[in-house]
Amino acid sequence: MVLESIARVIKVQLPAYLKRLPIPDSIAGFIRLTVSEWLRLLPFLGVLALLGYLAIRPFLLKKKQQKDSLINLKIQKENPKVVNEINIEDLHLAKAAYCRCWRSKTFPVCDGSHNKHNELTGDNVGPLILKKKEV
């Protein structure tokens, strides 16, 4: 019963549907189609677009998968929240860079580990740079 229904759709109804579609002979013929003819073509064109997309989807470029979902992988994991407080008045250098990627071996001071992290994940994180105001 089910196979007979499927066979009827494929052998009888689908060819009859395709014969009734207002497909023009040339590209210019698409311009002359009326609104009702376009509405009759929409389901057919939608199915063609879906099949085309499904055919090329494996070849589309995929986003680079991030290697790790956690940001902080190892620094002060025993604390519920990592906070480092540094008084700006205590800065002895003209410029200081602090880590924001959590990959630095000298955390909280930046050692440039974000460069490798950015390369691997496609991220764009960088350090927090504090400079003394020049007067």
From Swiss-Prot:
Lumenal-facing ranges:
1-37
Q: Which UniProt keywords apply?
A: 2Fe-2S, Autophagy, Endoplasmic reticulum, Iron, Iron-sulfur, Membrane, Metal-binding, Mitochondrion, Mitochondrion outer membrane, Transmembrane, Transmembrane helix
Key word Protease present: no
Cofactors: [2Fe-2S] cluster
Q: Which GO terms describe its biological process?
A: autophagy of mitochondrion; regulation of autophagy
Q: Which GO terms describe its molecular function?
A: 2 iron, 2 sulfur cluster binding; metal ion binding; protein homodimerization activity
User: Where would one find the signal peptide in this protein?
Assistant: none
Q: Where in the cell is it found?
A: Endoplasmic reticulum membrane; Mitochondrion outer membrane
> So where does [2Fe-2S] cluster get bound?
C99, C101, C110, H114
Which cysteines in this chain are paired by disulphide bridges? none
Cofactor comment text: Binds 1 [2Fe-2S] cluster.
Transmembrane ranges? 38-60
- Cellular component GO terms, alphabetical: endoplasmic reticulum membrane; mitochondrial outer membrane
- Does the UniProt entry include the keyword Secreted? no
The segments annotated as topological domain Cytoplasmic are: 61-135
Coiled-coil positions: none
| Mode of membrane association | Single-pass membrane protein
Protein task: Regulator of autophagy that contributes to antagonize becn1-mediated cellular autophagy at the endoplasmic reticulum. Participates in the interaction of bcl2 with becn1 and is required for bcl2-mediated depression of endoplasmic reticulum Ca(2+) stores during autophagy.
Family (UniProt): Belongs to the CISD protein family. CISD2 subfamily.
The protein's assembly and partners = Homodimer.
For this entry, the protein name equals CDGSH iron-sulfur domain-containing protein 2A
- The record lists the organism as Xenopus laevis
